[in-house]
Amino acid sequence: MHYEGNKEAKGYTKSISETEQLVRANLSKDGKTLDITAGYVKEYGAKDISKFEFLKDLTSLAMGTNLMGSQGVKYLAQSEVLVNLTSLNLFYNQIGNDGVKYIAVSDNLLSLQILNLTDNDITDEGAIFLAKFLPLFTNLIRLDIRYNKIKEEGKEALRKVQEKISLKHLLLDRVEGFQVKA
């Protein structure tokens, strides 16, 4: 059963020690890379991860298929621990437009070079909002936003901003693939 008030659906039943155990088991020896794809940490697990001080040197975070929703992304985007990230992979997390907005306005994620938001129920609203803030992400060279619900208006906003910034690879949908800037 999945609904907004369901604590289990949000990951509330997983203890912080369980989340920490999962993170430590999947953290690279140098502490720079963490891949917990399909770890299903959900919203509260993302909250725990955002506070783990031992992740302060993390540069690459892969958290696809963790179903954290927009609130989980809010914790990551506002984390004072995860400020060194250069790669963030959040495919299939049901973040929607609200989640994209948390990322777009985050001062803590400005070091990102690679951002994957594939399959997250993002619409034109989220794409247009993200496009407004992309110029602040001066290090971003790859944005993967395929398999969302973005129509032509949102795609056009992202294409226009790509012309003005350092974004070299813009992946909008499965048909057109890479939009490479020369």
Enumerate the language-model features and the residues they cover:
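Conserved hydrophobic beta-strand positions in leucine-rich repeat
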Residues: 34-36, 58-63, 85-90, 112-117, ...
